[in-house]
From Swiss-Prot:
Organism: Gladiolus murielae (Abyssinian gladiolus)
CDD domains in alphabetical order: S4 (cd00165)
PANTHER family given in the database record: 30S 40S RIBOSOMAL PROTEIN, SMALL RIBOSOMAL SUBUNIT PROTEIN US4M
Residue span(s) of domain S4 RNA-binding: 82-143
Summary of subunit composition and partner proteins: Part of the 30S ribosomal subunit. Contacts protein S5. The interaction surface between S4 and S5 is involved in control of translational fidelity.
PROSITE patterns linked: RIBOSOMAL_S4, S4
The name this protein goes by in its record: Small ribosomal subunit protein uS4c
Gene Ontology biological process: ribosomal small subunit biogenesis; translation
Family to which the UniProt record says this protein belongs: Belongs to the universal ribosomal protein uS4 family.
Origin: domain of life: Eukaryota
Xref: InterPro entries: Ribosomal_uS4 (IPR022801), Ribosomal_uS4_bac-type (IPR005709), Ribosomal_uS4_CS (IPR018079), Ribosomal_uS4_N (IPR001912), S4_RNA-bd (IPR002942), S4_RNA-bd_sf (IPR036986)
Transmembrane segments annotated in the record for this chain: none
Subcellular compartments: Plastid, Chloroplast
Taxonomic lineage of the native organism: Eukaryota, Viridiplantae, Streptophyta, Embryophyta, Tracheophyta
Gene3D superfamilies listed in its UniProt record: Ribosomal Protein S4 Delta 41, Chain A, domain 1, RNA-binding S4 domain
């Protein structure tokens, strides 16, 4: 993890740790001139590691975004941001996306009153995300919400009620609220040149 954040910069979905400011300087000195391919590859890796996806999963999302109407890069980011594991992370119900994925896999999370154990479940506007009524599920979420550093900077498309352990998806995310500094066009270019 630390090698990844040292090389690619801050990845809030992967870890709350930040790269040291001196390591950026060393990387720039060591790397010399970066090729266009390397720049595109690093943006793709940043996206992959932040959302915790395999190469195949990311490629699948790129294909879906390519078939949809509109900007492929924007649609790709919307698809990734509307995943259940990412929504839990953005709500502050988990400290990282892998942590959110574990909550979903262990069946602690309900969407609209039904247990969902698929982290890649695509949330829609007006979805209500809650925890199971079990004490253990509520305790896990309560700990995350209490220690969540990004509670006050909740994106516009989400609302949380920390006392009822309930989150609401208001709308599809606007590109201004993406929680990662990324140039999505470079990611799309990377995949368009691979085929």
């Amino acid at each position: 993890r630390f090698k990844k954040i040292r090389r690619l910069g801050a990845l809030p979905g992967l870890t709350s740790k930040r790269p040291r400011s001196g390591s950026d300087l060393k990387n720039q000195l060591r790397s010399g001139k970066r090729s266009q391919y390397r720049i595109r590859l690093e943006e793709k890796q940043k996206l992959r590691f932040h959302y915790g996806l395999t190469e195949r999963q990311l490629l699948k999302y790129v294909h879906i975004a390519g078939k949809a109407k509109g900007s492929t890069g924007q649609i790709l980011l919307q698809l990734l941001e509307m995943r259940l594991d990412n929504i839990l992370f953005r709500l502050g119900m988990a400290s990282t996306i892998p942590g959110a994925r574990q909550l979903v896999n262990h069946r602690h999370i309900l969407v609209n009153g039904r247990i969902v154990d698929i982290p890649s479940y695509r949330c829609k506007p007006r979805d209500i995300i809650t925890t199971k009524n079990k004490q253990r599920s509520k305790a896990l979420i309560q700990n995350f919400i209490a220690s969540s550093p990004h509670q006050e900077e909740l994106p516009n498309h989400l609302t949380i009620d920390p006392f009822q352990y309930k989150g609401l998806v208001n709308q599809i995310i606007d590109s201004k609220w993406i929680g990662l500094k990324i140039n999505e066009l470079l990611v799309v270019e990377y995949y368009s040149r691979q085929t």
